[in-house]
């Protein structure tokens, strides 16, 4: 990719870097942004970073400036989900009986991407529900989605209940 092609991606890199690495407790300096961009093969100057931050603000990102001592930094002040909301989502996923351990880990990783890397560390918590056994059935996630789709379309939903007999054959309850 030519240098000019990398330059066209600069604004996206600045946005991504701020979203992933900044929060109120961890503002990012212009020098840190320049170093990050240079590590990605993008040349940048202080003035162009200020212009990029202003463009992101015009786009609708809530980027705040703060001063710590003699150093100015920038951080994303508001996000789609605030940290307490993300904690609630993580707790709900962890305590859900019908979500497997594997899917729980996958969903939590996705939820963590909605916070800065510093805030994401606070989402690593374990919720224990006494006598709660997580399902081993990976397809239940998709079954719940199908049930929800049927309900939202006002369709009748029919279930066939069965048990396994001694010969490990399905034996339908109530005549199937």
Regions found by a protein language model. Give the residues of each.
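Short, basic/aromatic recognition patches that contact phosphate-bearing ligands
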Residues: 1-92
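Bulky hydrophobic/aromatic content
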Residues: 82-167
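Short, solvent-exposed loop/turn segments that connect beta-strands within catalytic domains
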Residues: 70, 166-170
């Amino acid at each position: 990719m030519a240098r000019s092609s990398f330059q066209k991606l600069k604004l996206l890199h600045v946005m991504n870097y701020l979203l992933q690495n900044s929060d109120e407790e961890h503002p990012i300096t212009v020098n840190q942004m320049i170093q990050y961009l240079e590590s990605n093969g993008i040349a940048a100057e202080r003035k162009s970073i200020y212009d990029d931050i202003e463009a992101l603000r015009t786009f609708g990102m809530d980027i705040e400036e703060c001063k710590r001592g003699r150093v100015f930094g920038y951080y994303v002040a508001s996000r789609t989900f605030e940290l307490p909301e993300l904690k609630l989502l993580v707790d709900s996923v962890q305590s859900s009986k019908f979500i497997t351990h594997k899917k729980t880990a996958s969903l939590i990783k996705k939820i963590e991407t909605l916070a800065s890397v510093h805030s994401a560390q606070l989402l690593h918590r374990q919720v224990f529900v006494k006598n709660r056994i997580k399902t081993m059935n990976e397809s239940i996630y998709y079954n719940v989605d199908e049930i929800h789709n049927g309900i939202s379309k006002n369709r009748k939903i029919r279930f066939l209940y069965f048990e396994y007999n001694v010969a490990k054959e399905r034996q339908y309850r109530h005549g199937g």
